[in-house]
């Protein structure tokens, strides 16, 4: 198929370091690798990561009316039979273009965007935002979501909309090549977090748990890689616990450098805070698994499914249980090895090729048969 993939969110720059940017690059490249002709249209090209290997990349203009015209021109110029859009608060231009040209639109939904914006970003017109969202979903041909919680959410907003759950993926070759080394020449056990520093990621709680663990485990070290709005509070938590000499705060790391960071670790943590609607399918967790790292995680949302038998789970927001899981892995090299091997095996189910195949199935379901030529 000829596919147009659209991302109108300026906060997700194509070459950016955060997970959303990595997802845009990797799913678009995976669809191209599957045999489709993929045009990628994004609002921002900024960042330091390399562009994905797709047929063509276009930067969208700012005014939404101009974007709709630009999207329509791209559909016509490249004979696109379907549009896949990463749903955002700024969505709408692709819907207008698709309606005018009678081309099916499939939304890729990675979060309940309107509710998230009201909760964390000060969105004031909640009811208007939800009404607009419902209109966009009802006009779409289908939706692809990354978690079961999101499937429930989208189906509640638009009951007639076909919804497929497709978890995020991981570049198996890149991360498995950088599996943890056992020949570092020291006995330090490195516990790591790699990802955006956002309030709901719970990195401050990880620092608190590490502080308790460090009192009785002199061999442990904490490695934190990432940037975001919570970075200042994370640094403050480290200073308050007098842990500056035992915590490495690396700041923002390019995505192509993440495997090398993971290769220095012995175990990894996804310390999410409890929420009523945990909708994440974290790239970081899948990358931890592919790198052969045991994962410590809260038993919430789809995380038990994503981690499988490759980690230790604890009740969300239970700091003592988090400390216990960390301590158990720190003190048992055999357990770390067994869970690490299970992690690599389990990660094979989440390669981007499989993700692209599942997304393709949804796209093919909404495209007339005569338009589906070219898909592998």
Enumerate the language-model features and the residues they cover.
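Conserved acidic donor-binding segment of nucleotide-sugar-dependent glycosyltransferases
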Residues: 312-320, 328-333
